[in-house]
Amino acid sequence: MNSFEPQSQDSLQRRFHQDNSTTQQPRDTTTPFIPKPASKNHNNSNSSSGAAGRSFQGFGLNVEDDLVSSVVPPVTVVLEGRSICQRISLDKHGSYQSLASALRQMFVDGADSTDDLDLSNAIPGHLIAYEDMENDLLLAGDLTWKDFVRVAKRIRILPVKGNTRQVKRNE
């Protein structure tokens, strides 16, 4: 048996108003709480630090705008011809070179060499593309890194097709 008895809404409101009756100003309980942005140096003067310097103290959190924009879900990495996909967190990488290194470790056996590694040679014989939010397939590396992290929904690793025309030799 649970000894907890639920209290009615009226008794909760009464208790809330009794607890707040000792304060100087009554609180308005009808409007929602909206955290106010504070400057980085935590004083009340208006600073021109811009959007990057704002932090929100609303719920005991100091969250930078860049941090909020970098929290993205992991994207699916699909290697054409394989039935099992991988997932990778793009916000854990700082550049295309870092992504290329991670992709090489995922899909290339014995991938120890990272000298002069970029997306064009991360996985030999393959091209690295991505799907954006509109399901367009685009070549990875065309956008700045931050924009790529923001719009990439899926990374596709496509095999490079060889010359499909075969010249017949007269022998």
Swiss-Prot record:
Composition bias, Polar residues: 1-11, 19-32
Regions of compositional bias (Low complexity) in chain numbering: 40-49
Superkingdom of this protein's organism: Eukaryota
Biological process according to GO: auxin-activated signaling pathway; response to auxin
A GO MF term: DNA-binding transcription factor activity
Region (Disordered): 1-51
Domain notes per entry: The N-terminal half of the protein contains the conserved domain II which is required for the correct degradation of the protein through the SCF-mediated ubiquitin-proteasome pathway. Interactions between Aux/IAA proteins and auxin response factors (ARFs) occur through their C-terminal dimerization domains III and IV.
Family: Belongs to the Aux/IAA family.
Name of this protein: Auxin-responsive protein IAA33
Organism field: Arabidopsis thaliana
Lineage, top ranks: Eukaryota, Viridiplantae, Streptophyta, Embryophyta, Tracheophyta
